[in-house]
Amino acid sequence: MGRGPKKHLKRLAAPSHWMLXKLSGTYAPRPSAGPHXLRESLPLXVFLRNRLXYALCGREVKAIMMQQHVQVVGKVRTDTTYPAGFMDVITLEATNEHFRLAYDVKGKFAVHRISAEEAVYKLGKVKKVQLGKKGVPYVVTHDGRTIRYPDPLIRANDTVKIDLATGKIXSFIKFDTGRLVMVTGGRNLGRVGVIVHREKLEGGFDLVHIKDALENTFVTRLSNVFVIGTEAGKPWVSLPKGKGIKLSISEERDRRXAQQGL
């Protein structure tokens, strides 16, 4: 009987959104313990080697990171298996590049480059609001942050804008009808739309009805909804290619044909 934490991860058991080839080895890099769960994160080794192709192997990734060229959310990271997750900002000082991890409509983490002005903050979904010792209020975000003395109007499911230099809340968005949201789980992962209606179910999961830019309506759980803007067309963060609009197979075919001039 095995005891203790698991230290290995078979490549076939790795999350599909890492997009690792089945025949390129027996094992995959297992994410370290960190702010994001294993199946909701992307190890820095996979990001640098497989997505950016800045390294050919894990040894080269280690050499890059030990030179302290890689920052995640404003802090230097030297662990090649550090788990970066949704809304995290990855900075490469050597090339002066900034990336934000966000989902595309295929459910994969997109390589989304952002400007230096946008790289100074991130968004966090409020998971709970509580009182600590001596009555000190605090909020806990989706990435494990605990922020004390928040605005009294902040509630669960709201989104806070976090300044990476200070770690403090700069502003927040209330969860309400008409807000621009991105889906972070389920079959609609990566889609972006506006909240139309929140359906409360007794003894079950609350459902949220969302309408995208093409007037298509879909439903997902409340736990999968992440507010990213106050209204349609005005997100607080730039969106990856596709802008969160999911097309059918025939619509994608027609778009490719139009781009090729056929």
From Swiss-Prot:
Instruction: Quote the CDD domains the UniProt record gives.
Output: KOW_RPS4 (cd06087)
Ranges for domain S4 RNA-binding? 42-105
Q: Does the keyword Ribonucleoprotein apply?
A: yes
Identify one Pfam family in the record. Answer: Ribosomal_S4e
* Keywords tagged on the record: Ribonucleoprotein, Ribosomal protein, RNA-binding, rRNA-binding
Gene3D superfamilies, per the entry = 2.30.30.30, 2.40.50.740, RNA-binding S4 domain
Mind telling me which GO cellular component terms the entry cites?
Answer: cytosolic small ribosomal subunit
UniProt keyword Ribosomal protein present: yes
Family named by the database record: Belongs to the eukaryotic ribosomal protein eS4 family.
Name the UniProt record assigns to this protein: Small ribosomal subunit protein eS4
Task: Tell me which species this is from.
Answer: Candida albicans
